[in-house]
Regions:
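Sequence context surrounding c-type heme c attachment/ligation sites in exported
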Residues: 23, 27-129
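Bacterial N-terminal signal peptides that target proteins for export
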Residues: 1-8
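N-terminal signal peptide c-region/cleavage motif recognized by signal peptidases
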Residues: 15-19
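Repetitive helical segments and hydrophobic/amphipathic motifs
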Residues: 11-12
Length: 129
């Protein structure tokens, strides 16, 4: 019985790894990166409002949101796959693919800035950010 459970688990893992290696569908890639950018916006909006005084300052919430943005900022690049740039459902311009190195540098700069912001926000002090 134990041997059968191990074999079933192994077969399941092998099947999952085969699916993970399959080429992603461009539509799925578009949905993936749009979802991430929506989550980034969801967190940045209140942060901006706190900085502008439109919302009361909440250092704990700001810090949490900054950490979310730092984590999320590392995720979108993998969603920019060939065939996902000129779709009607995407605002990603074909120029991104043509100028990949420049785009990659800018995304890396965003990741670095988000990490710096998250670190500064840990204090909860508005003046630190």
């Amino acid at each position: 019985m134990k041997k059968m459970a191990v074999l079933s688990l192994t077969a399941g893992l092998l099947s999952a790894s085969t699916l993970a290696l399959a080429t992603p569908d461009p539509e799925d890639a578009i949905d993936y990166r749009q979802g991430i950018f929506t989550a980034i916006y969801w967190n940045f909006g209140p942060m901006g409002d706190m900085m502008k005084g439109k919302l009361d300052w909440d250092g704990k919430d700001f810090s949490r949101r900054a950490a979310n943005v730092a984590t999320l900022s590392t995720m979108p690049l993998e969603g920019f796959i060939p065939g996902s740039y000129s779709d009607d459902d995407s605002d990603a311009l074909p120029a991104i693919e043509k100028n990949w190195d420049d785009f990659n540098e800018r995304m890396t700069a965003f990741q670095e800035s988000a990490a710096v912001l998250a670190e500064a926000a840990k204090s909860g002090d508005k003046a630190s950010v």
